[in-house]
Amino acid sequence: LGLREKDPVFNQFAIHAWFDNFDRRSATRNPDKVDYIFIHFLPLTNTWVWQIPITETITSIGVVTQKQNYTKSGLSYDDFFWEAVKTRENLYDALKASEQVRPFKKEADYSYGMKVLCGDSFVLVGDAARFVDPIFSSGVSVALNSARIASKDIIAAVRNNDFGKASFAEYEGMIRNGIKNWYEFITLYYRLNILFTAFVQDPRYRLDVLQLLQGDVYSGERLKVLDKMHEIVATVESDPDHLWHKYLGDMQVPTAEPAF
């Protein structure tokens, strides 16, 4: 269809593999949480690691960074992965003690959008519509919710025997609003960097953040938690002596509005 556009801001790069008998206790002291999904922040700017259980013994580990970080390193994919995780000693030791059961795989240029989300006789859902970043599995949320929301317009289109673009207007409006919220949230996440952990653990904001992460972003109402995140970023940015100032990420976006 020729609708795909590369995201002008997010230029992330991921290297990942599967490991057998990785000791998940290295990520938490709580035995009830060893099989949770974990995110590990790394010292390298805008870089983090995912830890996702696949089976009882196999774990997916992936390093996500800005493409320029990898390019500047001059390292192979394998070496970059190990150099990155080496900055988290407990994670590195646990990985080295496990068995890598899949070769490293790279993912690049995966942040994109579409000029339109629907047209005569077609609707784009999930990754076919938009993908920003793998953080918090937002792509899974968009896929499930876009399919759910599209089904209403599709059923009505079949009932009315009208498959013109206008029949999918409600879907397009809701999805664009939801994607806008995800985009803004992910941008703020990278700017807050490691400070996001302090924010999400604050009881004043925790429930609102969890609702957002569960996909409650499509209603059309302004999400107050995003305004709170903006306030914190602005406060820290404006004060070079702020205790948190040196921990801010360097991803700057003039506007949180997606370009498409």
Regions found by a protein language model. Give the residues of each.
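Tryptophan-centric aromatic hotspots in well-structured domains and transmembrane helices
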Residues: 15-19, 48-51, 110, 122, ...
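A general structural signal for short secondary-structure boundary/capping elements
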Residues: 32-42, 95-101, 107-110, 170, ...
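Low-complexity, flexible helical/coil segments
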Residues: 20-28, 52, 87-88, 96-102, ...
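C-terminal helical "tail/cap" subdomain of flavin- and related membrane-associated enzymes
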Residues: 152-260
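Predominantly flavin-linked oxidoreductase catalytic cores and closely associated redox partners
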Residues: 1-92
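FAD-dependent flavoprotein oxygenase/oxidase catalytic domain
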Residues: 56-57, 65-68, 90-93, 99, ...
